[in-house]
Amino acid sequence: MKNDKTILIIDDDSKNIFALNAVLKARKYDCVSANSAAVGLEMLKQNKNIAIVLMDMMMPEMDGYEAIRVMKNDEELKEIPVIAITAQAMTGDREKCLEAGADGYVSKPVDISELVKLLDLLI
């Protein structure tokens, strides 16, 4: 492991989770995943070893924007950094993610070197 901390991947698309998990584990990161924001928030409350969240922004029921707001308003969770991962790459989308409380932003398809730089910076 790069460290003793865990990355939580929250994405409703199992293919995205699988791909990120494979790439990050190959780089010696420890990963866990959730297929919805609600499940991810519950995992964050139960697993104190999660160091950072990779959050898909477009999910049904609770989207990434709302999930980040919930995290940032929770005393236990507000210090955990979040990297927004989204297919939305138009002008203003990055700013919208950061305004919601994300600490970083990566557009899909994910540039792994960019993601690793952010992880190293934020963990």
Language-model-detected regions and their locations in the chain:
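C-terminal output helix
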Residues: V110-L119
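Alpha4 helix (beta4-alpha4-beta5 surface) of REC/receiver domains from two-component response regulators
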Residues: E66, A89-G104, K117
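Helix N-cap/capping motif at the beta->alpha junctions
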Residues: S33-E42, G64
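Charged docking surfaces used in two-component/phosphorelay signaling
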Residues: F18-A26
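Short amphipathic alpha-helix used as the core "switch/output" element in two-component signaling
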Residues: E42, Y65-K78
